[in-house]
C-alpha cells in the first residue's frame, strides 16, 4: 500500500518526485545539484536551493519575512488605532502557523483596539548577518519580545546582545525555557529574572544542576498549573506581574491560535502604554492535557489508556489487518506543542502509514521534557506490568528525559527497560527546509545531530530516520513520503521480532573479507569470528532456533563457508549460496541502474561468473552465513582509489537484495568490527532514500557486533546502517614480557646491580652494551663503543637507560590472542586489566592509583619516579620496577581470593566484604607486607580495592550472547559507552548497545590537563631535535574513537598548540574559545594543519567548527609574527593565493562529505600502487576538503592548494596512541593518515619533518619519535613469541593477524620511511627461516601465508628491505610452493 500523507506537500514538483519515488540521484551526494528546470518555486525556496548549492554556506536561507504579519495597509493609521509590534525567536517553526493565524484574526476584527505587527525568527536564521541586522532593526521599534527554547550558546548570545540594548525601552520581554543568559532578559512590569542563577533568585533552583535533569521544564509546568491561582489573591504589583508571566507561559504552551490571541491581548492591554485602560477583553488560557494519548481520528485526547483502547477497538474505519488481535502495536512519542499548534500533519502521516501496514498505534504526548512517566502510564498494562506495545518510535527527536539543555539518561534507561521493546528515535527537520536537507551533503544540521541524534543514542535510541520536512513558506512540518514508509516498515519489522517464534525466525549472519582473499574471510578487530559464530549458533540452537546442518566444529564451519565445493581445481571463489540472474537482480534492486555509471551493466566482474551475480556463503536451516562483498577496489583499484565518490558494485547490491528479498531475513547480524555497508556514499547523518547505506539495508533490522573500544565507528554504523550495535570485549591486555637477547639483557642488568661496586662492574657494562647493540637498542639508547673506560656514574647512567628501555618493552601492554563471543576472560586473565585500571588516579572518585600509594610509602611522588626512570636514573628505574611488581602481586593476591578452583570469579561482593577492614587478612596487605611497601596507607588501599572489586565483576561478566538474543527477540538492549575500559570501566560489561558521548561535552577539564602535558613534552622534544627552535607548524590527525575514549584530549592538544582555551556554557557545553595571553602561554602560538578522519567529521563536526573558529581568531590577533606562527603563515598564504587573511587561515581538513580515508591503506593492502608519488597524490586528492566556520552548512569544500601550502610549512607530524589495544601496526588507519614523506616533498627546503607519536596508554604519558614507536611495536608484537604464539592459538584467523602486522609495517615504510631494516630481517628470521614456524603458518592458513611471503618480496622490491639474495630466492621458492599447496587444497 502506498504511503498515506495527511497534508499536502507544498514544495516544488521536482522535489516531490525526488521524495516520492526511489531517487536516481546517488551522484548528487557529492556533486553540485541544480534545481529542476522550470520548477515553480517561491522566492524563499529558491533562496534555500541557492544556499545549499552555492550560497553563503549557512544551513538555512529562509527569511523572517514569511513570518511577518502586519495590519491591513492604511487601515490602522486611518482609524487612529495604535500599532503593537511583537518580535519572537523560537527554536522550531511549529508556532509559525499558529501565531500567524492568531494575528490575522486579531487584525481582521473591525472592533480591535490595536493593530498587531508580528515578525518571527528561527534562532538558526540569526547566523546570517543580514538576517541578524534585520532582527536588530525590528527590535528597535518593537513593543514586545518573546523567546523560547534558545539553547544554542553562540546564537543565544546574539539574541541577548540585541535584546539587551532595547530591553529597558520595550514594554515587555518574555522568555520561556532557554539558556539563563536569555532568561535573565525577562521583564514584565515589576517582574524580572535579572538575578537568575544567583542564590537569592527564586528561580535559581530551576537552573541548579541536579541529577534529575529533566526537572527544569517539569518544574515550570507545575508552576504554570499552581502559581496563577495563588498569586491572583496577592495584592502586590509584583505578585500580579509574576502571575501574568505564568499565565503567559500557559498561553504559550497552549499554543493554539485562540490561546495566542488572548496572550497577545493580555500583554498588550497590561503593558503597552498606548493601550492602558483600553477595552480589550481576553479569556483565560484553554488548558490542554499535560500528557495523554492523541489520535487524529479520536473525538478527544485521552488520559486513560483503557479508554483509548476501548475507543480504538470500536473504530469502524479500520482495515482487516488492524482487526487481527495479533497485529503489532507501535507506541509513538509526540511533542505536545505540535499537536496544540495544529502542526501535526507529519504525525498524522506516520499514524496512517502504520495503520495502513497493519500496525495498531498508541500515540502518547507530553508537554514537559520528561516522557518517562507517560511511557509507563500509557504504554504498560498497570495490572500485568507488561507493555501494550511491541516497539516504541519517538517522533520528537529529543532524549526521552530532558530537552536541548539537560538530560537524565539513567531515568530514561530505567523507563525503557520496563518497556523492554526496541526504541527508535526518528527526526523531523528543525533547522533546514526540505530542499536544503535534500541538497546538503552533510545531511542533518550539526546542532540537530548533537541535540537529536547523539543525545537519544545515550538512551538506547536507534534508527535516526528523517521522516518530516519543513515548508519554508508556512513553517509547517510535512511528511516525507518515502522516509515515512521506510520508518514505519522498519518499526514493524522490529516489532515482528517480538512476536515471531524462534523456530521461524530467519537470521543472516554477515562476515567480512578485506583485503579480498580466502585467507581474510572473517576479518574483525580482535575477534575470532568463526569460533564466535559457532559458539553463537550452538547457543541459538539450544534456544530453539533452526540451525539445521551445523557442522561439528568451528574448523569445519570455516571449510564449508570459504571453499567452493563445485570447483574441480584451484578456485579463488568461496562457497556459492545463490546465483542471481541479471533479470532477477534488476527487478528486485530498485537502484541497480544507478550503479552502472561506476560499474557498467550487470553482472560485471565482481561476485560474478559472467552470467549471474554470486552470493557467497552457506545456509544452515534458518541461518545464512554470508560473506559481504568488498568495496570493489580490487577491480580497478587506481581509478576508484582516486575517486572522491564511489558506489557499491552490482555484487554488493545483490548480496543485500538476496538477504532481504530472497532469503527474507528477519534480522541481519553483522559480525565484528567492521564492514563496508556503513561507509558507503551518502549523507553523513540523516540520510535520504538516495543514500546507499539506506538503500542497501532496506527494511531489515540490523544487529551489529562491534568492538567496545571503537565507539566512533560503531556510531557511524548506528547512524548510517541503522544498527543496534552490541559491544564485544577485546582480549585482556598482558605485559609483553622479554625474550631472547632482551631477557639476557635483563639478567645482565640484575647482575650489574649486585656486582657494580666490585671489579666486575666494567666487564658487565661492556656485556650490556654489546648485547644491547645485538638487540638493536642502540637506535633508542646512545651507547659508547665497547671497551671504553667509563667512570662509575656514567656506567650507571648507561645501564639505567638500557634498563628503562627494556622495562618499557617488558611492561608494554598487548592483547594476546582473539576474543570469542560468549567466553569472558578468566579471573587470572583479568589481572592485567585490573593492574592497568589501578594505575590511574581517579580524583573525581577520590581514588589514588596503586603506584601512587606505593610511591608515597617510600616518600616519593609517582610522577617524579616516572620522570627519573625516563631519564635513565638507575635507582628510579629499579624503584619503578619494584612498584610495578608489587602492584601486580597485590592485585593477583586479591583476585585469587575471589576465585574458585575452576579459575572462575564467584560472589565478589560477599568475598570482598569478608576481606575489607580486617587489616593483615586483606590479601593485598598480606602481599605488600613482604615488600618494602609494608607501610602503604590502608584506607587508600581499601578504597582502591573496593573499586577494583566492582571492576572485576564487570570484566568477567558475559552479556554478549544474552544481548544478541534480546535483540533477536525484539527486546531493549541496555545502552552503554564505548571506549577504553581501563580509562572508563563503565564500558564494562560488554554486550551493551554501544554509544559515543555528547559531542558538546568535550574537551573535558581532565582532557585539557592531559593535553597540556603532552603538548609541552612534544614541543620540548622538538626543540631538542631542532636546534632549540620551536616548530612553526605541526601537522596532526584527529580520530573519532581517540577523542571519545579520552574525552577530547587530542582536540584539546590542538587548542593548546595555538594558545586558546575552551569556554563551557551554563550547561557545561563547549561551543566557544578564548585566547590564552602570550604571557601566560610562555611561547609562540604554533600553527597547525588538522587532518580529521571521516569518522571524526561525522561525529564531531561542531568541534571542527570550534577548531576553525579558534584558528581564524588566532590568525586575526594583532601579535608579532615571531610569537604567532598561525598569523605569520596565514599572511604569507593570503598574499600567495590572493585571498583574505581569514580564508588563508583555513587549517581544518578531512574527506569530502560521505567519504572516508585517504585510501592509501587500501592501495598498500592490495599492493596496487606503483610509486610513493601516487600514494601522495591520492592522499591530497582525498583529504584536501576544508571545513569553513563562516559557511558551516556548505559541508567540506575542496581547497587543495591551501592544504598543500599549509602542509609545506610543517616542521613536524604528530599522532596519538591512547589505548593498549591498538598501536601503529595493528591497524592501517595510522599510516593511511601519515603525511611525513608528503610534507618533505612539499617543503621548499626538501627537509623531512620530525615525526612524533604521543603515547598516553599508561599513566606515564610519553612522546616518542615515529621510528622509536615502530621499533617498540615490532619488539612487543610482531617479533615477540608471547604475541605471535597467542595469535597462533586462534588458528586460521591468527595467521592473518600476523600477516596484517607485516603489511602495515610496509605501509609505514611507504608513507614515512621510518622502519629500520633489522625489523624486516628479524621478521624474516622468525616466520620464514624457522622451518617449524613456516610449516605451521602454511598449514594453518595457506592464503594468508602466501600474502606474508608476497609482502616480504614487495618490501624488498620497493627498496624498504635490504637482504641477501639467498633470502629472496628462498621467498620466491616458498611462494611457488604455497601456490601449489593452495591448489592442492582446492583440488
UniProtKB/Swiss-Prot annotation:
It comes from the Eukaryota. It catalyses: protoporphyrin IX + Mg(2+) + ATP + H2O = Mg-protoporphyrin IX + ADP + phosphate + 3 H(+). GO terms for cellular component: chloroplast membrane; chloroplast stroma. Residues 1-50 form a transit peptide. One of its GO terms (molecular function) is ATP binding. Pathway: Porphyrin-containing compound metabolism; chlorophyll biosynthesis. InterPro entries: BchH (IPR011771), CobN/Mg_chltase (IPR003672), Mg_chelatase_H_N (IPR022571). Its EC number is 6.6.1.1. Keywords: ATP-binding, Chlorophyll biosynthesis, Chloroplast, Ligase, Membrane, Nucleotide-binding, Photosynthesis, Plastid, Transit peptide. It is found in: Plastid, Chloroplast stroma; Plastid, Chloroplast membrane. It is a peripheral membrane protein. Transmembrane segments: none annotated. Pfam families: CobN-Mg_chel, DUF3479. Its main location: plastid. It is an enzyme of class 6 (ligase). GO terms for biological process: chlorophyll biosynthetic process; photosynthesis. Disulfide bonds: none annotated. Involved in chlorophyll biosynthesis. Catalyzes the insertion of magnesium ion into protoporphyrin IX to yield Mg-protoporphyrin IX. The reaction takes place in two steps, with an ATP-dependent activation followed by an ATP-dependent chelation step. May be involved in the plastid-to-nucleus retrograde signaling. Belongs to the Mg-chelatase subunit H family. The magnesium chelatase complex is a heterotrimer consisting of subunits CHLI, CHLD and CHLH. This is Magnesium-chelatase subunit ChlH, chloroplastic. It comes from Oryza sativa subsp. indica (Rice).
Amino acid at each position: 500500500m502506498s504511503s498515506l500523507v495527511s497534508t499536502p506537500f507544498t514544495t516544488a514538483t521536482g522535489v516531490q518526485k525526488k521524495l516520492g519515488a526511489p531517487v536516481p540521484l546517488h551522484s548528487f551526494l557529492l556533486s553540485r545539484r541544480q534545481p529542476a528546470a522550470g520548477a515553480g518555486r517561491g522566492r524563499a525556496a529558491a533562496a534555500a536551493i541557492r544556499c545549499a548549492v552555492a550560497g553563503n554556506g549557512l544551513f538555512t536561507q529562509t527569511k523572517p519575512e514569511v513570518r511577518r504579519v502586519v495590519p491591513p495597509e492604511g487601515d490602522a493609521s486611518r482609524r487612529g488605532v495604535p500599532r503593537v509590534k511583537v518580535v519572537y525567536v523560537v527554536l522550531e517553526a511549529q508556532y509559525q502557523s499558529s501565531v500567524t493565524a492568531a494575528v490575522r484574526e486579531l487584525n481582521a476584527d473591525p472592533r480591535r483596539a490595536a493593530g498587531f505587527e508580528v515578525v518571527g525568527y528561527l534562532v538558526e536564521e540569526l547566523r546570517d548577518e543580514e538576517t541578524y541586522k534585520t532582527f536588530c532593526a525590528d527590535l528597535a521599534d518593537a513593543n514586545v519580545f518573546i523567546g523560547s527554547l534558545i539553547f544554542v550558546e553562540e546564537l543565544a548570545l546574539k539574541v541577548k546582545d540585541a535584546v539587551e540594548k532595547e530591553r529597558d525601552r520595550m514594554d515587555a520581554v518574555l522568555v520561556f525555557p532557554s539558556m539563563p543568559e536569555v532568561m535573565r532578559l525577562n521583564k514584565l512590569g515589576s517582574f524580572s529574572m535579572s538575578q537568575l542563577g544567583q542564590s537569592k533568585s527564586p528561580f535559581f533552583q530551576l537552573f541548579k544542576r541536579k541529577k534529575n535533569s529533566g526537572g527544569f521544564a517539569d518544574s515550570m509546568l507545575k508552576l504554570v498549573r499552581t502559581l496563577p491561582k495563588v498569586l491572583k489573591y496577592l495584592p502586590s504589583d509584583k505578585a500580579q506581574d509574576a502571575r501574568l508571566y505564568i499565565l503567559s507561559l500557559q498561553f504559550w504552551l497552549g499554543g493554539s491560535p485562540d490561546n495566542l490571541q488572548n496572550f497577545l491581548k493580555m500583554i498588550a492591554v497590561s503593558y503597552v502604554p498606548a493601550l492602558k485602560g483600553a477595552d480589550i477583553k481576553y479569556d483565560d488560557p484553554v488548558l490542554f492535557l499535560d500528557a495523554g494519548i492523541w489520535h487524529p481520528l479520536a473525538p478527544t485526547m485521552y488520559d486513560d489508556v483503557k479508554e483509548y483502547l476501548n475507543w480504538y477497538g470500536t473504530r469502524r474505519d479500520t482495515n482487516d489487518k488492524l482487526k487481527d488481535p495479533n497485529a503489532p502495536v507501535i507506541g509513538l512519542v509526540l511533542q505536545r506543542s505540535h499537536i496544540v499548534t495544529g502542526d501535526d500533519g507529519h504525525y498524522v502521516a506516520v499514524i496512517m502509514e502504520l495503520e495502513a501496514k497493519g500496525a495498531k498505534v498508541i500515540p502518547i504526548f507530553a508537554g514537559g521534557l520528561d516522557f518517562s512517566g507517560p511511557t509507563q502510564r500509557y504504554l504498560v498494562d498497570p495490572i500485568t506490568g507488561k507493555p501494550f506495545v511491541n516497539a516504541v518510535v519517538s517522533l520528537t527527536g529529543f532524549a526521552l528525559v530532558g530537552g536541548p539543555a539537560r538530560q537524565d539518561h539513567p531515568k530514561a534507561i530505567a523507563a525503557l527497560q520496563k518497556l523492554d521493546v526496541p526504541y527508535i528515535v526518528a527526526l523531523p527537520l528543525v533547522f533546514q527546509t526540505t530542499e536544503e536537507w535534500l541538497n546538503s551533503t552533510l545531511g542533518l544540521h550539526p546542532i540537530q545531530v548533537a541535540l537529536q541524534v547523539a543525545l537519544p543514542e545515550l538512551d538506547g535510541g536507534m534508527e535516526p530516520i528523517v521522516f518530516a520536512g519543513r515548508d519554508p513558506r508556512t513553517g509547517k512540518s510535512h511528511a516525507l513520503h518515502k522516509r515515512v514508509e521506510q520508518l514505519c516498515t522498519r518499526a514493524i519489522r522490529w516489532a515482528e521480532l517480538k512476536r515471531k517464534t524462534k523456530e521461524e525466525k530467519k537470521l543472516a549472519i554477515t562476515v567480512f573479507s578485506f583485503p579480498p582473499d580466502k585467507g581474510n574471510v572473517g576479518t574483525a578487530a580482535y575477534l575470532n569470528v568463526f569460533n564466535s559464530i559457532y559458539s553463537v549458533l550452538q547457543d541459538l540452537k539450544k534456544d530453539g532456533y533452526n540451525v539445521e546442518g551445523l557442522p561439528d566444529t568451528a574448523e569445519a564451519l570455516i571449510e564449508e563457508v570459504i571453499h567452493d565445493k563445485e570447483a574441480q581445481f584451484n578456485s579463488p571463489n568461496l562457497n556459492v549460496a545463490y546465483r542471481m540472474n541479471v533479470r532477477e537482480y534488476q527487478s528486485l534492486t530498485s537502484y541497480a541502474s544507478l550503479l552502472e555509471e561506476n560499474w557498467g551493466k550487470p553482472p560485471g566482474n565482481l561476485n560474478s561468473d559472467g552470467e549471474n551475480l554470486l552470493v557467497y556463503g552457506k545456509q544452515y536451516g534458518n541461518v545464512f552465513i554470508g560473506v559481504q562483498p568488498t568495496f570493489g577496489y580490487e577491480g580497478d583499484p587506481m581509478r576508484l582509489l582516486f575517486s572522491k565518490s564511489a558506489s557499491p558494485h552490482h555484487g554488493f547490491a545483490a548480496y543485500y537484495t538476496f538477504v532481504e528479498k530472497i532469503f527474507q531475513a528477519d534480522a541481519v547480524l553483522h559480525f565484528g568490527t567492521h564492514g563496508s555497508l556503513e561507509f558507503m556514499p551518502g549523507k553523513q547523518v540523516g540520510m535520504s532514500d538516495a543514500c546507499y547505506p539506506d538503500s542497501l539495508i532496506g527494511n531489515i533490522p540490523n544487529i551489529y557486533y562491534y568492538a567496545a573500544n571503537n565507539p566512533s565507528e560503531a556510531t557511524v554504523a548506528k547512524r548510517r546502517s541503522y544498527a543496534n550495535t552490541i559491544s564485544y570485549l577485546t582480549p585482556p591486555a598482558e605485559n609483553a614480557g622479554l625474550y631472547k637477547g632482551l631477557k639476557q639483557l635483563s639478567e645482565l642488568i640484575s647482575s650489574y646491580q649486585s656486582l657494580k661496586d666490585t671489579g666486575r662492574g666494567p666487564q658487565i657494562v661492556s656485556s650490556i652494551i654489546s648485547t644491547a647493540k645485538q638487540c638493536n637498542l642502540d637506535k633508542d639508547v646512545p651507547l659508547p663503543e665497547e671497551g671504553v673506560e667509563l667512570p662509575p656514574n656514567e656506567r650507571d647512567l648507561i645501564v639505567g637507560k638500557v634498563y628503562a628501555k627494556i622495562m618499557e618493552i617488558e611492561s608494554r601492554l598487548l592483547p594476546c590472542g582473539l576474543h570469542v563471543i560468549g567466553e569472558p576472560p578468566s579471573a587470572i586473565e583479568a589481572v592485567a586489566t585490573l593492574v592497568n585500571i589501578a594505575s590511574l588516579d581517579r580524583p573525581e572518585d577520590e581514588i589514588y592509583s596503586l603506584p601512587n600509594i606505593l610511591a608515597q610509602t617510600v616518600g616519593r611522588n609517582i610522577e617524579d619516579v616516572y620522570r627519573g626512570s625516563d631519564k635513565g636514573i638507575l635507582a628510579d628505574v629499579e624503584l619503578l620496577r619494584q612498584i610495578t611488581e608489587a602492584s601486580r602481586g597485590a592485585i593477583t593476591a586479591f583476585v585469587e581470593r575471589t576465585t574458585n578452583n575452576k579459575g572462575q570469579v564467584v560472589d565478589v561482593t560477599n568475598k570482598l566484604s569478608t576481606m575489607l577492614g580486617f587489616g593483615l587478612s586483606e590479601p593485598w596487605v598480606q602481599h605488600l607486607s613482604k615488600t618494602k611497601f609494608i607501610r602503604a596507607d590502608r584506607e587508600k588501599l581499601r578504597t582502591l580495592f573496593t573499586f577494583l572489586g566492582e571492576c572485576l565483576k564487570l570484566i568477567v561478566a558475559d552479556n554478549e550472547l544474552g544481548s544478541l538474543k534480546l535483540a533477536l527477540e525484539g527486546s531493549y538492549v541496555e545502552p552503554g559507552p564505548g571506549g577504553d575500559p581501563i580509562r572508563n570501566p563503565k564500558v564494562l560489561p560488554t554486550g551493551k548497545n554501544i554509544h559515543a558521548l555528547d559531542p558538546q561535552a568535550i574537551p573535558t577539564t581532565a582532557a585539557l590537563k592531559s593535553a597540556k602535558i603532552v603538548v609541552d613534552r612534544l614541543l620540548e622534544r622538538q626543540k631538542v631535535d631542532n636546534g632549540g627552535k620551536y616548530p612553526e607548524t605541526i601537522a596532526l590527525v584527529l580520530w573519532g574513537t581517540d577523542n571519545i575514549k579520552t574525552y577530547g584530549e587530542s582536540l584539546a592538544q590542538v587548542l593548546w598548540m595555538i594558545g586558546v582555551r575552551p569556554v563551557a556554557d551554563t550547561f557545561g557545553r563547549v561551543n566557544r574559545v578564548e585566547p590564552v595571553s602570550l604571557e601566560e602561554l610562555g611561547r609562540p602560538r604554533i600553527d597547525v594543519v588538522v587532518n580529521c578522519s571521516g569518522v571524526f567529521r561525522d561525529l564531531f563536526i561542531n568541534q571542527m567548527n570550534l577548531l576553525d573558529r579558534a584558528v581564524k581568531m588566532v590568525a586575526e590577533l594583532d601579535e608579532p609574527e615571531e610569537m604567532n606562527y598561525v598569523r605569520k603563515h596565514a599572511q604569507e598564504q593570503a598574499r600567495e593565493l590572493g585571498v583574505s587573511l581569514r580564508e588563508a587561515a583555513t587549517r581544518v581538513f578531512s574527506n569530502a562529505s560521505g567519504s572516508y580515508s585517504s585510501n592509501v591503506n587500501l592501495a598498500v593492502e592490495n599492493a596496487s600502487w606503483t610509486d610513493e608519488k601516487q600514494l601522495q597524490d591520492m592522499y591530497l586528492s582525498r583529504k584536501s576538503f576544508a571545513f569553513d566556520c563562516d559557511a558551516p552548512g556548505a559541508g567540506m569544500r575542496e581547497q587543495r592548494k591551501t592544504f598543500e601550502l599549509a602542509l609545506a610549512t610543517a616542521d613536524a607530524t604528530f599522532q596519538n596512541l591512547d589505548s593498549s589495544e591498538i598501536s601503529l601496526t595493528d591497524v592501517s588507519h595510522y599510516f593511511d593518515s601519515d603525511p611525513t614523506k608528503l610534507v618533505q616533498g612539499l617543503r621548499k627546503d626538501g627537509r623531512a619533518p620530525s615525526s612524533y607519536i604521543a603515547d598516553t596508554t599508561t599513566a606515564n604519558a610519553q612522546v616518542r619519535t615515529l621510528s622509536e614507536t615502530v621499533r617498540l611495536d615490532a619488539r612487543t608484537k610482531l617479533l615477540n613469541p608471547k604475541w605471535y604464539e597467542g595469535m597462533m592459538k586462534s588458528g586460521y584467523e591468527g595467521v592473518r593477524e600476523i600477516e596484517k602486522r607485516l603489511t602495515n609495517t610496509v605501509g609505514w615504510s611507504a608513507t614515512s620511511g621510518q622502519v629500520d631494516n633489522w625489523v624486516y630481517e628479524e621478521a624474516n628470521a622468525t616466520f620464514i627461516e624457522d622451518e617449524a614456524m613456516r610449516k605451521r603458518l602454511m598449514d594453518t592458513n595457506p592464503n594468508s601465508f602466501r600474502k606474508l611471503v608476497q609482502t616480504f618480496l614487495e618490501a624488498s622490491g620497493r627498496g624498504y628491505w635490504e637482504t641477501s639474495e639467498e633470502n629472496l630466492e628462498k621467498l620466491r621458492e616458498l611462494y611457488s610452493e604455497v601456490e601449489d599447496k593452495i591448489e592442492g587444497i582446492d583440488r
